[in-house]
């Protein structure tokens, strides 16, 4: 229902307009206060890169963060990652992730980023505290990437990168809750880089797509061609589950059942087992896998995806970040 409202297909969005106006007024005033200096942002002693969204829901932001971190690491840059830690609840903040940190403590995305990149990752509702935690433990850090946080103006940033779903784009264009917007589309004029996931990019936007890899078994780490799996039940607890289901079909998999879950939904062994009948194979997103690996069964698999770019624009972005990290 919410997708139909945000896309404008349902007229119910009009009933939510008063709340959207209030949301837009409050968020606009907050940004204006920081812009005019009425509120002061904390500036880190190293460059900060924000990778965020203008809309709620899945846009492909986390794969972009992972790509960015890996590319910087390959070029010898010491990079850390901070996040709000949505869906997690730590005993205390800031929380610096370790191999023992769970998604219940830190949230899905931070654990996924930590496991994929090995970079120092810290979470806190106050992102500046997360940055300080990383710099205390890793004083030689050269640059910080913040996963989400475009609207977290308490943390000063040197580069802003926005990721857009190229198919859904901005829906009906209204602020939450009548539409999907955290900020209006005009905000794009003030950011450094706009990356478009799928669809047709517009002038000045960098095209990107998510490329699936081989299926990975949660228990053994064994890899295989996803199309070889049979009697598949697909599960996705991400911002936009239909994208994952469409990816499976593109890979030649026709699931017997598709189960969309809420983003950041907690899962137990019994919850997941209840989705399957005897002889069926479960395929989930990598983001779900970080929650399920501890209690996985032999027939549970996940499909990793990686951000892929074409053209010279990504190299220009990386060159800019390397220059900042080097203090040039």
From Swiss-Prot:
Q: Which GO terms describe its cellular component?
A: plasma membrane
Superkingdom of source? Bacteria
Look up the record and give one Gene Ontology term from the biological process aspect.
Answer: lipopolysaccharide core region biosynthetic process
Q: Which residues bind ATP?
A: 55-62
Keyword Ligase recorded = no
Respond yes or no to whether keyword Transferase is given for this record.
yes
Q: Which InterPro entries match?
A: LpxK, P-loop_NTPase
- Chemical reaction(s) catalysed: a lipid A disaccharide + ATP = a lipid IVA + ADP + H(+)
Q: What is its EC number?
A: 2.7.1.130
Could you tell me the keywords of this UniProt record?
ATP-binding, Kinase, Lipid A biosynthesis, Lipid biosynthesis, Lipid metabolism, Nucleotide-binding, Transferase
Q: In which pathway does it act?
A: Glycolipid biosynthesis; lipid IV(A) biosynthesis; lipid IV(A) from (3R)-3-hydroxytetradecanoyl-[acyl-carrier-protein] and UDP-N-acetyl-alpha-D-glucosamine: step 6/6
> What terms describe the molecular function in GO for this protein?
ATP binding; tetraacyldisaccharide 4'-kinase activity
UniProt family annotation: Belongs to the LpxK family.
> What this chain does, per the record?
Transfers the gamma-phosphate of ATP to the 4'-position of a tetraacyldisaccharide 1-phosphate intermediate (termed DS-1-P) to form tetraacyldisaccharide 1,4'-bis-phosphate (lipid IVA).
Descriptive protein name: Tetraacyldisaccharide 4'-kinase
| Gene designation per UniProt | lpxK
């Amino acid at each position: 229902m919410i997708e139909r409202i945000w896309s404008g297909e349902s007229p119910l969005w009009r009933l939510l307009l008063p709340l959207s106006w209030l949301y837009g007024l409050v968020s606009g005033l907050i940004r204006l206060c920081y812009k005019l200096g009425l509120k002061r942002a904390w500036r880190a002693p190293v460059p900060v890169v924000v990778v965020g969204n203008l809309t709620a829901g899945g846009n492909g932001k986390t794969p972009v963060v992972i790509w960015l971190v890996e590319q910087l690491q390959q070029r010898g840059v010491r990079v850390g990652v901070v996040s709000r830690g949505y869906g997690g609840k730590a005993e205390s903040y800031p929380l610096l992730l370790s191999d023992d940190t769970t998604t219940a403590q830190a949230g899905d995305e931070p654990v996924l980023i930590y496991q994929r990149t090995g970079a120092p990752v810290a979470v806190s509702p106050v992102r500046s505290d997360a940055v300080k935690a990383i710099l205390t433990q890793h004083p030689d850090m050269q640059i910080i990437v913040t996963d989400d946080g475009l609207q977290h103006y308490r943390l000063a940033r040197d580069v802003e990168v926005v990721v857009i779903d190229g198919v859904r784009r901005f829906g009906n264009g209204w602020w939450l809750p009548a539409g999907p917007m955290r900020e209006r589309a005009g905000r794009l004029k003030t950011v450094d880089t706009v990356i478009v996931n799928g669809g047709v990019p517009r002038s000045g936007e960098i095209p990107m797509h998510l490329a699936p890899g081989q299926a990975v078994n949660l228990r053994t780490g064994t890899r295989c061609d996803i199309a070889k799996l049979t009697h598949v039940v697909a599960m996705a607890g991400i911002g936009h589950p239909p994208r994952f289901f469409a990816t499976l079909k593109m890979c030649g998999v026709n699931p017997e059942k598709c189960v969309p879950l809420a983003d950041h939904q907690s899962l137990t062994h019994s919850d997941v087992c209840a989705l399957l009948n005897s002889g069926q194979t479960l395929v989930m997103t990598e983001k779900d896998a970080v929650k399920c690996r501890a209690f996985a069964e032999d027939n549970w698999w996940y499909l990793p995806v990686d951000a892929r770019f074409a053209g010279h624009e990504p190299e220009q972005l990386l060159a800019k970040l390397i220059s900042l990290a080097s203090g040039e």
